[in-house]
Amino acid sequence: MPTTSYTLSTTTELSFEEAVERVRAELQAEGFGVLCEIDVQATLHEKLGVEEEPYLILGACNPSLAHRALSAEPELGTLLPCNVVVYRRDETTHISAIDAERMLSIVGRDDLAPIAAEVRTRLAAVVERATKTS
């Protein structure tokens, strides 16, 4: 799975709409709910009048993992929810999720590492399975 230094990413030949549908289903399968969504394309068009390709940010949260993390460190709320993005560039659909291990490494708390690892594993599964064909 291609990644940046802070994301778990892949590309797919799926349409934008199909990729969003699959990401939502895989998030649910991994115990995540979508707390918010930001249609970046629509927002930039409305606020700036620019035309962009589809770009959607899904703010995902696994309640059990969030509860464990916030119980250990209440300030972690500033890093939540975990963002998953689906966007189109150059006729290709991209799916990316935040790498929770990288994100939580800035906190400097070793006791949070198991939670971060579990979130990373679950989000990596979402990104990977969203592009699988049956």
Question: Which residues make up each language-model segment?
Answer:
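Terminal, regulation- and interaction-focused segments at domain boundaries
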Residues: 1-30, 128
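N- and C-terminal low-complexity/disordered segments
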Residues: 24-25, 36-38, 132
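Beta-strand/loop substructures that line and gate deep hydrophobic ligand-binding cavities in soluble
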Residues: 83-109
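Solvent-exposed residues in well-ordered beta-strands and their adjoining turns
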Residues: 13-15, 61, 87, 98
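Short Gly/charged-rich anion-binding patches and loops
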Residues: 21-22, 39, 118, 122
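Compact, glycine-rich, soluble single-domain proteins
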Residues: 33-86
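Well-ordered alpha/beta subsegment
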Residues: 106-134
